[in-house]
């Protein structure tokens, strides 16, 4: 703000100048900044866009003009100078209430969390030229980041559309197993002062197996499901195997195993997996973010907020989209003194996709012949990816792709934010900034055995801690079961009765995931009431049919 000067324009309104090297740049008109702002707003034509992105705040005159002209639009203002924004907050508080003002990528994420992405219809960009001219690279970078984050939110929404019904189905079927299952919350804070190891299925995992075997009594070893077969084939036991995948193919990670591990499964995980493993822990995925007012907000997996009203808290784990990222948050919650990444190549080290010994290799072996071996199959897969070269831990470069590089960015960002050291022991894999590269053997040799071993802590919790309480949940589900039958019976004939049933909070919670696409379509189109009623009836009947099929499998548990 030291380079900015506020003066009075000829119209009597405040105006703003930027002084640099003896040169004065006018941020607003020296004659009438209000009229100037109206002209700027007139140049903006968002068409169908629902969000207007503005580069440059100034004193906010153009923001007021925009909001007056487009009152239903969301406005996000990118501003480089935090002190200027604070001055506007003090002198023009009404401007601050009209838009979200962001200075960095983290604040972009916070601003987007307050927007219902389901109503998103595109963005329009308005560049406040005087502000932009001061820091063009900053505004270009921030605009690109904002668009990237919006794309990510849309991708999340599409994922939800694709998998939400499956998630709800799996949650309900897994609820049958909850009364014999430990909530992950019981492990939080129980491993203080102990290192935590995340074992992933990258190609370099095979090089760390000897050291990993020596770490069993010294560190909490959490293995992602993809890597478990590799460890078992080398007689290495992790303390916990973690799975998140809702799809049935995830059972391939466990077919043919001789030792059933302690399974930590997200409640959306495939019931085929959770039924296969006797000793298990359930967790739920949730996302925490800071709202513009500074409060912490929580966004949970569909249905789980409602479920936990009856079962009590199961325990949240935040995820960056992969099992390894969830394991990272688990170790933080467990209280580990450091986090060690093993097999986290985030690259095609040695031009391989996974470590040898995963189910992927098992699937490919029958397809090999003297003309096509595993190396050829790996190469064919890699060629289909959008690849790039990144620095490797061995001093050279290594091939990665767009998705793996996104995960690398996640680990780099997370390692920077946590207060404990993060070690990358992955030889040959991608360099992960904000972590320290150390061979696993060197770490294991330095560690001392704790007084109480990781396995002893887990054994105690499994034998002494209460499992998840489900009696109240199944009493409620039994009541809903009758309402679903009623819904199916009246949906086609009695519109008023149909809407009354759907207005019930419990029914809405269960039916909405199965009606989401229809509700989204209705929200985005200007339909007459008759058409809306017809769509709602069809969607409600389909939801009732699907839920009743699920409830039939829960029949014995219903009270």
Mark where each language-model region is.
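Polyanion-binding loop/helix "lid" in catalytic or ligand-binding cores
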Residues: 320-324, 371-428
